[in-house]
Amino acid sequence: MKTELSQKLFEKANDLFPGGVNSPVRAFKGVGGTPRFIARAKGSHIVDVDGNDYVDYVLSWGPMIVGHCHPEVMRAVQDAMKEGSSFGAPSPREILLAELVRERMPWVEKMRFVSSGTEATTSAIRVARGFTGRDDIVKFDGCYHGAGDPLLVKAGSGVETLGLPDSPGVPADVARHTLTAPYNDLPALEKVFEAKGASIAAVILEPVVGNMGVLVPRPGFLQGVHDLCKKHGALFIVDEVMTGFRLSSGGACGLYGLRPDLVTFGKVIGAGLPVGAFGGRRDVMDRVAPAGPIYQAGTLSGNPMAMAAGHAALKLMTEAAYRKLETLSAALADGLSAAAAEAKVPVQVNRVGSMLTVFFSHKPVFDAATARACNTRRFGAFFHAMLEHGAYLPPSQFEAAFLSTAHTDDDVARTVAAARVAFAEAAKVA
């Protein structure tokens, strides 16, 4: 496989950007080697600058649920751009997308559009603090909620790959208001509330963790977190930046029957354009400026092109589309498990809907500690063998892979065939 142009571009990029990239996980630090520079994408495939074609399971880290360059999404964006790329004023497209969100998630009684998932989560935290008059928040070890200072404590995603439990630059006075507990461990959370319950403004969680790889909630865990929040007067914030509109038309909240106080969105809601949102209970959201005193603002919030892209993509995500995703994702997970068994490589394939991770572990993976115990060297060998055989996976053991409605049975078959070779390569690594 030729990679000369990617290598040359990476050399130039290292002179221009920290680590040669504009988001850490793209640098391949978790797997080694040269990141591929992508020239174009269509459907379920991406093509790098050297002309190598890959079945894409990164999908821009989740947003491209209908695939790359879907004609209806492209048409919607082009039509919006003809009318103006940004107004800095309200537009009808904001209403269209918001109404569709509330139609599918009635518990989002009011919402605010922003420009990223990080902006959504940091805003939700501010709102929770302002609404409750409390300062502390609780997050779970390994859950990533964006790059905001209060949330870079025991975070997953790129922080996990780099082995940084916290980030320099986050003041101790900020970090001390972020309390943590292990994911899937209700008794541990109960102890946190027993110690600090009166000062806790909110608990924020990924309902299905995607940023330590996919961690599946144990039965009763999510509702248990909600019940503890209600008991102690804290808000229950569900971070659906990754899971929203991906796991079902109602996201993870719809899938698991949750009714959060606040919920955050990103990724799918913008179909590849920069969009985030937060929303929830009417009485809470009515405290947000200009209706209330809790300030939040953004120059590009509700950008008309982004609103058009999100609306077009969500309209395409019918119940039939979700059924197709489930069938394809189950086939891929089963195929990967079988290929690993053939190679006698112990793995755990964790999956919920169209999110999955192959963990190189003998034991079940259900929290940050069990994820960190995985064999990342084997994952690196597996990743590079898959890349050589035309399957583009997340370049980290601690990230989720995604499928789109553009993926086909042939894509899955090609990927499973590549995995047979890749697991054999991984088996050679101690």
Curated annotation (Swiss-Prot):
This is Glutamate-1-semialdehyde 2,1-aminomutase. One of its GO terms (cellular component) is cytoplasm. It is found in: Cytoplasm. Gene3D superfamilies: Aspartate Aminotransferase, domain 1, Type I PLP-dependent aspartate aminotransferase-like (Major domain). It catalyses: (S)-4-amino-5-oxopentanoate = 5-aminolevulinate. Belongs to the class-III pyridoxal-phosphate-dependent aminotransferase family. HemL subfamily. Pathway: Porphyrin-containing compound metabolism; protoporphyrin-IX biosynthesis; 5-aminolevulinate from L-glutamyl-tRNA(Glu): step 2/2. Signal peptide: none annotated. Its cofactor is pyridoxal 5'-phosphate. One of its GO terms (molecular function) is pyridoxal phosphate binding. PANTHER family: GLUTAMATE-1-SEMIALDEHYDE 2,1-AMINOMUTASE (PTHR43713), GLUTAMATE-1-SEMIALDEHYDE 2,1-AMINOMUTASE 1, CHLOROPLASTIC-RELATED (PTHR43713:SF3). Its EC number is 5.4.3.8. The modification N6-(pyridoxal phosphate)lysine is found at residue 267. It is an enzyme of class 5 (isomerase). It holds the Pfam family Aminotran_3. It comes from the Bacteria.
